[in-house]
Amino acid sequence: LLKRPYGLLLICGPTGSGKTATLYAMLRMLNLEETKLICLEDPVEAEIKGAIQIGINEKIGFTFAKGLRSVLRQDPDTIMIGEIRDKETAELAVKSALTGHRVLSTIHTNTAIGVVTRLMDMGVEPYLIRATLMGAIAQRLVRKFDGTTYHGRTALFEYLEIPTNSVHWDQLEAHLLVSLEDSAREAVSQHVTSIEEVHRCG
């Protein structure tokens, strides 16, 4: 998905599921010598070499939406928005993707397919979602289990890739390359974690 020159890619999951860490990892995969990357974050959590990183400050009125408007004037190739929280930011993110930018962000919903519903609930027109959304990743963090004790954590992923903007919403499941259930089953079978831990994390 990162090879596509424009479109919207969203990472979702509950609070504390590692969404931002995944977002940072994906951004570091970009060739920043050839790609102009601007990040809007609240707060800036880690340095991304070669990127322009801007901290959001809602207390003084510098919101994601206002930051995104100013960023678009600088003509970036890729835009990272720390989180899509409201209708204004969602609409600006979608319209940025529509005008030839690669946009990556996080959004608060539980499943990759649920991203579509969440955007519509925020008031984004379905035709705009269809024209821009190229994929979504849902994730959970689970504790590793060695058979006797828990130590460290690992991620379970769900991966939705939308090949074209002609895909119908009722066909989205056909484009779910990996489900959270598949990922959990694999982690348990490889003795990475326990079935109890999977159930605990939902």
Language model features: what each stretch is:
Residues 1-202:
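Short, flexible helix-loop junctions that flank or precede catalytic/ligand sites
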